[in-house]
């Protein structure tokens, strides 16, 4: 009997579309794989033969339970431990400079300590490029950082807000590092680990820097102000990962080994600054090897506007950014790279007639993506790489037999590729109840008729009459746990 030919030699099987059952399993388990790229917002250019390595060094984290599950699955399928190990290379997106291998073996993060950009590279901005694959050569994809601005050197002039891209705004993230005697090997970074602040030589923390009113009292809750950070102002440093916070601080400009008490210009990238612990007797945030301590400054007898500090109390400040990419193989391993990973930045609801439309704005959208509400696939229309539209499903898709919304129903919004890759968005859509459908229109019309309304990036609300309401996500009150600094 002749063999049955099922396809051309070397032909790849067609991609498996995601099933409702597979989506339900994903929503229950949430075994995501996440790639985090943490980096500074600016990079100092290197001239001639010098190599000014990026500081703090870009860092790649592999987060989520999916990495371990993927490794276990590959080893069950016959891969060796080495073949199931993720591998990564990082570069500055320039073919003239070789990509550098990141050592991820045995841990979920790695830093790229020897990246630099030379003066022969004329770009004013660039993005880091992280290429990832498994040890058996299966491709994961190429992940890009956020945009990084190239600067020649830190500005020594009195900064003005005309150069706003070099200034530091309240509520943004910064890294702080200390370098004794300008030696790269002595660099230590402010970091939180095990519930304590410490000075790490290996990992750096990203801290929200919040501007406070001068009369704001110490407490776990505090009211923050908008605007750019100026020297002499009261600030709060809050770890972006743990929520741990330092006591209220006054940020002061550093000149050589002195803190200037009367400086009031805007804080700029890569400036050296000191942090005075408010309402103390000249105590400053300081490091002593790995410990974070308080250091008491000495008054300058001839210059009352200055206080003498030691090297450990002088910190270099720089703004940081984060690129985050999350994916899950909903129908098992795929042949194509998971990148580009779509990122949703905002939602806008548009309604009319019996149909409510949701517009998604973001990056890396492709025609092979569909929007899902919970375990329901929505009719999706691709516009361009930054915009997609979808039809909001009827409430009956989630609650069988319901003709109108009886109680609030919240469903997650995800994007799904045509080969079963699920991209989590952290967005939810909420159906809000009403007494019942209007007598003069159909149930679907009562549920879905909508007025246009802007929806914040993390939640969308609708009631069954179709009037959509905004949900405020911006709060000026920040809660944190205050860490005590050792004296």
From Swiss-Prot:
SMART domains noted in UniProt: BTD, LAG1_DNAbind
Biased amino acid composition, Low complexity: 469-487
Principal subcellular localization: nucleus
PTM sites of type N6-acetyllysine: 162
Compartments, as annotated in UniProt: Nucleus; Cytoplasm
Pfam families per the UniProt record, alphabetical: BTD (PF09270), LAG1-DNAbind (PF09271), TIG_SUH (PF20144)
Keyword check for Acetylation: yes
Keywords, sorted A to Z: Acetylation, Activator, Cytoplasm, DNA-binding, Notch signaling pathway, Nucleus, Repeat, Repressor, Transcription, Transcription regulation
Any one GO MF annotation of this record: sequence-specific DNA binding
UniProt cross-references to InterPro entries, sorted A to Z: Beta-trefoil_DNA-bd_dom, BTD_sf, CLS_fam, Ig-like_fold, Ig_E-set, p53-like_TF_DNA-bd_sf, RBP-J/Cbf11/Cbf12_DNA-bd, RBP-J/Cbf11_DNA-bd_sf
Region (DNA-binding): 44-54, 152-157, 179-184
Span list, region Disordered: 452-487
Positions with biased composition (Polar residues): 452-468
Residues in IPT/TIG domain copies: 342-432
Coiled coil: none
One Gene Ontology cellular component annotation held by this UniProt entry: MAML1-RBP-Jkappa- ICN1 complex
Signal peptide feature range: none
Family the UniProt entry places it in: Belongs to the Su(H) family.
Subunit architecture: Interacts with activated NOTCH1, NOTCH2 or NOTCH3. Interacts with MINT/SHARP. This interaction may mediate the recruitment of large corepressor complexes containing proteins such as HDAC1, HDAC2, NCOR2, SAP30, FHL1/KYOT2 and CIR1. Interacts with EP300, MAML1 and PTF1A. Interacts with RITA1, leading to nuclear export, prevent the interaction between RBPJ and NICD product and subsequent down-regulation of the Notch signaling pathway. Interacts with SNW1. Interacts with CHCHD2 and CXXC5. Interacts with BEND6 (via BEN domain). Interacts with NKAPL. Interacts with ZMIZ1. Interacts with RBM15.
PANTHER family cross-referenced by the UniProt entry: RECOMBINING BINDING PROTEIN SUPPRESSOR OF HAIRLESS (PTHR10665)
Role, per record: Transcriptional regulator that plays a central role in Notch signaling, a signaling pathway involved in cell-cell communication that regulates a broad spectrum of cell-fate determinations. Acts as a transcriptional repressor when it is not associated with Notch proteins. When associated with some NICD product of Notch proteins (Notch intracellular domain), it acts as a transcriptional activator that activates transcription of Notch target genes.
Protein name per its UniProtKB record: Recombining binding protein suppressor of hairless
């Amino acid at each position: 009997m002749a063999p049955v030919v099922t396809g051309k030699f070397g032909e790849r099987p067609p991609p498996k579309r995601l099933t409702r059952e597979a989506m339900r399993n994903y929503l229950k388990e949430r075994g995501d794989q996440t790639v985090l790229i943490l980096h500074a917002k600016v990079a100092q250019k290197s001239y001639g033969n010098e190599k000014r390595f990026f500081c703090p060094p870009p860092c790649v984290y592999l987060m989520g339970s999916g990495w371990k599950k993927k490794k276990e699955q590959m080893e069950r399928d016959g891969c060796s431990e080495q073949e199931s190990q993720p591998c990564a290379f990082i570069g500055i997106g320039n073919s003239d400079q070789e990509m550098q291998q990141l050592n991820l073996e045995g841990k979920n993060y790695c830093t790229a300590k020897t990246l630099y950009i030379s003066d022969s590279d004329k770009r004013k901005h660039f993005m880091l490029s992280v290429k990832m694959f498994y040890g058996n050569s299966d491709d994961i994809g190429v992940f890009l950082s956020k945009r990084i601005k190239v600067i020649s050197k830190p500005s020594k002039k009195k900064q003005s807000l005309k150069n706003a891209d070099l200034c530091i705004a309240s509520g943004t993230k910064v890294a702080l590092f200390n370098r004794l005697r300008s030696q790269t090997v002595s660099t230590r970074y402010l970091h939180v680990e095990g519930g304590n602040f410490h000075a790490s030589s290996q990992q750096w923390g990203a801290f929200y820097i919040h501007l406070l009113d001068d009369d704001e009292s110490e407490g776990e809750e505090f009211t923050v102000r908008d605007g750019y950070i100026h020297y002499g102002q009261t600030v709060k440093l809050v770890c972006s990962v743990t929520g741990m916070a330092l006591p209220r601080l006054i940020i002061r400009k550093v000149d050589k080994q002195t803190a200037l008490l009367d400086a009031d210009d805007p804080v700029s990238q890569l400036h050296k600054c000191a942090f005075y612990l408010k309402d103390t007797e000249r105590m400053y945030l300081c490091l002593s090897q790995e410990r974070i301590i308080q250091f008491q400054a000495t008054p300058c007898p001839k210059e009352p506007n200055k206080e003498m500090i030691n090297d450990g109390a002088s910190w270099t400040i720089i703004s940081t950014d984060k690129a985050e990419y999350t994916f899950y193989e909903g129908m098992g391993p795929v042949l194509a790279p998971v990148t580009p990973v779509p990122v949703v930045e905002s939602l806008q609801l548009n309604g009319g007639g019996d149909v409510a439309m949701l517009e998604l704005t973001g990056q890396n959208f492709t025609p092979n993506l569909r929007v899902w509400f919970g375990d329901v696939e929505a009719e999706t229309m691709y516009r361009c790489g930054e915009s997609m539209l979808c039809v909001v499903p009827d409430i009956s898709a989630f609650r069988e037999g319901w003709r109108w919304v009886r109680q609030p129903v919240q469903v997650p919004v995800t994007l799904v590729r045509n080969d079963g890759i699920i991209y989590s968005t952290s967005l939810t859509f909420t159906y809000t109840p009403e007494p019942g459908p209007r007598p003069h229109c159909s149930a679907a019309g009562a549920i879905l008729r909508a007025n246009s309304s802007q929806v914040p990036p993390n939640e969308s609300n609708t009631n069954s009459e179709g009037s959509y309401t905004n949900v405020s996500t911006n709060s000026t009150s920040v809660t944190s746990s205050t860490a005590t600094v050792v004296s």
